[in-house]
A protein has these predicted regions:
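Catalytic/RNA-binding core of pseudouridine synthases
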Residues: 1-145
Length: 145
């Protein structure tokens, strides 16, 4: 790719792939916009949108490396989640309105949780929630909800 020294002097000439740990208060588009501003280039793209409240790896391609996006989007993904039992919201995340009062879930064992999680391991088909970054006709679902 680009000579690192010339990229420092002229950020617009930088080509490459950045691995960014997206914070929960940024959208994937916010990250792309920030990279565009710092590197002073419009040719910046990512390999997959993370939901607005999700944190994690966002792969960013810059300039000539944007040609690689098509080869990086089909890779398997791994998710790490934290559960709060006895609590549900209308959005399916912590920002929503509670659907019911918080209930005591202390009777649920770790074995029961592990058994329930088996349904979320491996290759699964999931219907995206309305409060997600999934786009329908170019509009994120969370904006339509």
């Amino acid at each position: 790719m680009t000579n690192p020294q010339s990229a420092i002097r002229n950020p617009q000439s930088a080509d490459g792939v950045l691995i960014i740990d997206k914070p929960s208060d940024w959208t994937s588009h916010d990250v792309v916009a920030k990279v565009r501003k710092i590197l002073r280039t419009r040719r910046v793209g990512h390999t997959g949108t993370l939901d607005p409240f999700a944190t994690g790896v966002l792969v960013i391609c810059v300039n000539r490396a944007t040609r690689l996006v098509q080869f990086l989007t089909g890779d398997d993904k791994e998710y790490l989640a934290t559960m709060r039992l006895g609590f549900a919201t209308d959005t399916g995340d912590l920002t929503g309105e509670p659907l019911l009062p918080v209930t005591d879930a202390s009777h649920i064992t770790s074995e029961q949780v592990q058994e329930a999680l088996t349904h979320f391991r491996g290759r699964i088909w999931q219907t995206p929630p309305m409060y997600s970054a999934k786009k329908v006709e170019g509009v994120p679902l969370h904006e339509l909800a």
